[in-house]
Amino acid sequence: FAEVTGGTFWKAYTPEQIAGTEPFQVGKGENITDMYKDLMQVYAPINLYDEKLRKLAKELGTAWVRVSGTWATKTYYDFDGTCNGKVPEGYLNVLTKEQWIGVLDFVKAIGAKLMISVANCPGLHSADEPWHPAEAEKIFALSKEYGVPIDGAEFANEPNMMEETGFPHGYTAADYRRDQDLFFVWLRKNYP
């Protein structure tokens, strides 16, 4: 997801790290951001209209485009432009309508199928409140309306990491099970 919105993501490995002669520096800290700060960098959004990228992607043959990951868990879908690029409280990233249309155009151009995961963070709900589809509805509806429906979905990425992934504070495995079930009931009912 960070490739689409831009943002902090993993640095490319150095040749020395690949060769095993340079260590990966994991910092000390209370949270994952502090621990991995030296292994990450800020990236601009990728240009999904780049002809070379599209040509190379087409050469793969039948493919799935997965727009997911830990960053998806914390992304707000600002399809009506109300945020003006400012991240709402409880989220970490903003996806604009133009960025999502870029994904849909890319998927269409290369003849791929689309798989996503959805927001499940403090901006959407607290741990003691059930997940609700307010954000998911935006992205599923726009995709369907645009003619590139979402073919596959996972509720969230890396549920084994709970709060480090971006889930609400105090979120438990039981909360995840509850919310994943709610997501799939909603999905089957509205976007079978």
Go through the PLM ranges and name each one:
Residues 1-155, 160-192:
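Non-catalytic accessory regions flanking glycosidase/transglycosidase catalytic cores in CAZymes
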